[in-house]
């Protein structure tokens, strides 16, 4: 199995931290994303959505999307679970994971892609398009994430972890999202 990634990318960092927390080491290929490697063969055939990271299994099957990769690795290596042990833990972790992704991470992703000049022509992940960068998307993304963080802060008072009593994937995604917001 081989992980194709780009270290500086937010989604690549998510998988890297997950691997570190699980104590897993897998073969990794660092794609030259800034040079457009994800739009060239063999990567176009392997991953037609052109996003990193993606996991190439020994069978040749490709698993893309950071959370899907983490879920697959969790299933293959259930020790030190980061998606929860009980049904209740799994549900609470999933709840917070969805909240962080939908209300903070994705809005911030759009904010960055609509503000940073190097993303001109690439405002949607994995695409090259003529969609213009829109400053209103940057403003809305920051406002949305700020609202989420402001609403969440009081809920976390006195808690060590975002979901439940143990470190989880929700904490990884939450911490990386807060870091992205800075």
What positions do the PLM features span?
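GST-like domain detector, emphasizing the conserved glutathione-binding G-site
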Residues: 1-135
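GST-like fold's C-terminal all-alpha helical module
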Residues: 102-182
């Amino acid at each position: 199995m081989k992980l194709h990634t780009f270290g500086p990318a937010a989604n690549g960092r998510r998988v890297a931290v997950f691997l570190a927390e699980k104590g897993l080491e897998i073969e990794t290929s660092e794609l030259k994303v800034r040079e457009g490697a994800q739009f060239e063969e063999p990567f176009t055939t392997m991953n037609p959505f052109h996003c990193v990271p993606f996991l190439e299994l020994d069978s040749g099957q490709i698993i893309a999307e950071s959370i899907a990769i983490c879920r697959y690795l969790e299933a293959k290596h259930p020790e030190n679970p980061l998606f929860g042990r009980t049904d209740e833990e799994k549900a609470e972790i999933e709840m917070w994971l969805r909240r962080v992704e939908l209300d903070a991470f994705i809005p911030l992703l759009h904010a960055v892609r609509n503000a940073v000049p190097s993303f001109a022509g690439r405002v949607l992940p994995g695409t090259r398009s003529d969609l213009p960068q829109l400053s209103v998307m940057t403003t809305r993304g920051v406002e949305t994430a700020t609202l989420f963080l402001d609403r969440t802060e009081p809920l976390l008072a006195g808690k060590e972890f975002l979901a439940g009593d143990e470190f989880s994937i929700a904490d990884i995604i939450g911490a990386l999202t807060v870091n992205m917001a800075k």
